[in-house]
């Protein structure tokens, strides 16, 4: 029975990790789409070396 609890616990931890990870990933967004992309994150759009960077407001 303890194996079942361990498997459920591991599944829950993996679920939380998968939920958090995409937020920390840098997305390749062109400068044209940058303002629209950053507005969904409530951040200010900025272009660095032709890459979109969202700065916290």
Curated annotation (Swiss-Prot):
One of its GO terms (cellular component) is extracellular region. This is Potassium channel toxin alpha-KTx 8.5. Selectively inhibits voltage-gated potassium channels Kv1.2/KCNA2 (IC(50)=183 nM). Expressed by the venom gland. It is found in: Secreted. Keywords: Disulfide bond, Ion channel impairing toxin, Potassium channel impairing toxin, Secreted, Signal, Toxin, Voltage-gated potassium channel impairing toxin. SUPFAM superfamilies: Scorpion toxin-like (SSF57095). Negative results: does not affect Kv1.1/KCNA1, Kv1.3/KCNA3, Kv1.4/KCNA4, Kv1.5/KCNA5 and Shaker IR. Belongs to the short scorpion toxin superfamily. Potassium channel inhibitor family. Alpha-KTx 08 subfamily. Disulfide bonds join 31-47, 34-52, 38-54. Has the structural arrangement of an alpha-helix connected to a beta-sheet by disulfide bonds (CSalpha/beta).
């Amino acid at each position: 029975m303890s194996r079942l609890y361990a498997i459920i616990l591991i599944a829950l931890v993996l679920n939380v990790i998968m939920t958090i990870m995409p937020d920390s990933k840098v997305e390749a967004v062109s400068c044209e789409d940058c303002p629209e992309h950053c507005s969904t994150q409530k951040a200010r759009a900025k272009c660095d070396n032709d890459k979109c960077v969202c700065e916290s407001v």
